[in-house]
């Protein structure tokens, strides 16, 4: 699986879902259960590193998501 860096582009806190835009332009689904710090929340604009893995309905998603911001 690819390891990528990107930015949280969309985040719906009540639903715990969003989108990561990778530095190479791909849009990956993001689920709160994939946030490595266990907080289950993030913010639009946060820089992240993740693995790309299979998601629902054949879409790719961000997995093992770690924040890059200090």
Identify the meaning behind each predicted range:
Residues 2, 24-26:
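Short acidic/polar mixed-charge low-complexity motifs
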Residues 36-49:
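Short nucleic-acid-contacting surface segments enriched for D/E, G, S/T with interspersed K/R
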Residues 7, 19, 49-51, 61:
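Residues located in well-ordered beta-strands
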Residues 14-20:
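Short aromatic-glycine-enriched beta-strand elements
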Residues 1-14:
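Structural detector for short beta-strands of small beta-barrel domains
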Residues 10, 22, 34, 64-67:
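A residue-level detector for short acidic-glycine micro-motifs
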Residues 53-70:
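OB-fold/S1-family single-stranded nucleic acid-binding modules
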């Amino acid at each position: 699986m690819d390891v990528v860096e990107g930015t949280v582009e969309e985040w719906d806190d009540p639903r715990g879902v969003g989108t990561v835009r990778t530095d190479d332009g791909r849009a990956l689904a993001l689920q709160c259960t994939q946030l490595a710090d266990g907080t289950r929340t993030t913010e639009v604009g946060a820089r992240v590193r993740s693995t790309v893995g299979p998601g629902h309905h054949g879409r790719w998603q961000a997995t093992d998501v770690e924040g890059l911001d200090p």
